[in-house]
Amino acid sequence: EKYNATDAERSYQEALDINSRYVPALVGIARVVGDERSLQRALAINPNSVLALETYGQLLLMNNRQEEADDYFERVLTLNPESLKTHSILAAQAALNQQDDEYAEHFARVNSFSPNNPKFLGDIADTLGNNYLFEEAVEFARAAIESDPNYWQGYTLLGNNLIRLGEEEEGKANLEIGFENDPFNVLTSNMLKVFDTLETYTTVESEHFKVNLSETDADILWPYLEPLLEEGYETLTSKYGFEPESPILIEVFENTEDFAVRSVGLPDIGPLVGICFGKVVTLISPDTLSANWQEIVWHEFMHV
């Protein structure tokens, strides 16, 4: 829950070393590493474990196995019609698919046993944000905080999605509120550390772009990057007949971990070297890459 996968995995393994049939630890391991076998074992021990069924459904959903996932969620609600997590998952899926009636049904059912539950709203905000619906995620995060101003995860969700929209000042302010009241949330802590890095960076601007980058990159890279960006803007807006709202914010990071944290909140992002959030693009400095950086810049701008 605090995005500290390393410590969580170690703690779950220590519990399993004591009792290898301890279902919550088997489920916990599965949540951390995505291990289906641990969930299968948990359900072999207790076929009616709501936690195991719920987690299995989430894992299947993440792997685009929607129909199988729905079967598990249906089993959960048969065992526990008031499962907040399952209702939030299904409500979020309905919101993603613009199934207003289905969303309203889950919202009403949750309100019947837990009115204005902030975690329900926060879970939906998290799902929407992870699916690049940042404005909608911001709305749900604000609603979660309005429901319970002491729901600190709501501030992290709000801040994270605001900065993906380029609203960095308000985003940072909300992250700081979240961190001050929940300092063990690794995602919040990581994001604020990236802001410390950005404070050492230089901001340069062109006609359609605002770019944050290190002083070294500002001296060496910017003379090449500025015409590349503006050429891309002119070419692609002409080609697609669409002019995005400007200035478009681009952040170029020297450190791959800073790039990963700014992009997803955690320091491991795999092989990705650039991400577009619509109004914001994050990139790794070409100093750290062997790939064609010009192609990467144009590719990410095409997503804008």
Residue ranges and their predicted role:
Residues 2-14, 31-41, 63-75, 96-109, ...:
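Structural signature of tandem alpha-helical TPR/SEL1-like repeats
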Residues 10-11, 37, 44, 112, ...:
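Juxtacatalytic substrate-recognition/specificity segment
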Residues 160-186, 193:
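TPR/TPR-like (Sel1-like) alpha-helical repeat modules
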